[in-house]
């Protein structure tokens, strides 16, 4: 159900990596576990390589519980994420299409993860995004469960079953709530960028591995 986003265009965030296409140096499944590996190597004018896996065109979901079990890579400049974008992003541009960040982590904030929504009304360009962070213990040595519970009324963000961000449907317009259509999943490890690179990049941390044990989607019949 996974494909690859490919390239080194900065991805709207001034990211420093080039995302490769199904290169086992950057994405490999072993013993049922996915590893996304960022490396310090030059590729098409970028100084780093990594991978970004997407279910776009293969699978998308509307509502449900989406859960990822992962172990995060340590290091300043790293920016692992598990997130969702609307299937209609080709016709409805970001941020109007909506974005759900199930988990983001930046290496210079070792003990925090973030859960955020972006919409036309609420996004980081305006500084109005609806995000919160939560303390995380041992993110680099233990697997943790990152989840959202998404209904027509709300999106809840959970770390190891602990609720830390609640985004309610205010029943205004799609600018506030574009979350009534299918979204696809993305898993990536970025290097640098507007969020990940705020404190620079520590080149001693490469290669860096973001390990994903599973991704599960639960939906009511």
Predicted region positions:
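GH16 jelly-roll
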Residues: 1-221
């Amino acid at each position: 159900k996974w494909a690859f986003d490919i390239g080194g265009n900065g991805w709207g965030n001034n990211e420093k990596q080039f995302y490769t296409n199904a290169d086992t140096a950057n994405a490999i499944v072993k013993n049922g576990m996915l590893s996304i590996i960022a490396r310090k190597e030059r590729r098409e004018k970028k100084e780093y390589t990594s991978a970004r896996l997407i279910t776009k065109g293969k699978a998308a979901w509307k509502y449900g519980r989406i859960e990822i079990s992962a172990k995060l890579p340590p290091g300043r400049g790293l920016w692992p994420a598990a997130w969702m974008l609307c299937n209609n992003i080709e016709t409805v541009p970001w941020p109007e299409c909506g974005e759900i960040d199930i988990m983001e982590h930046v290496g210079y904030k070792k003990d925090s993860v973030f859960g955020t929504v972006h919409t036309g009304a609420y996004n980081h360009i305006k500084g109005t995004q609806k995000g919160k962070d939560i303390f995380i213990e041992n993110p680099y040595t233990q697997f943790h469960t990152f989840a959202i519970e998404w209904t027509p009324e709300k999106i809840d963000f959970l770390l190891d079953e602990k609720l830390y961000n609640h985004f309610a449907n205010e029943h205004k317009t799609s600018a506030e709530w574009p979350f009534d259509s299918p979204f696809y999943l993305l898993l990536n490890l970025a290097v640098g960028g507007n969020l990940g690179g705020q404190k620079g990049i520590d080149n001693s941390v490469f290669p860096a591995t973001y390990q994903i044990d599973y991704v599960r989607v639960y939906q009511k019949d």
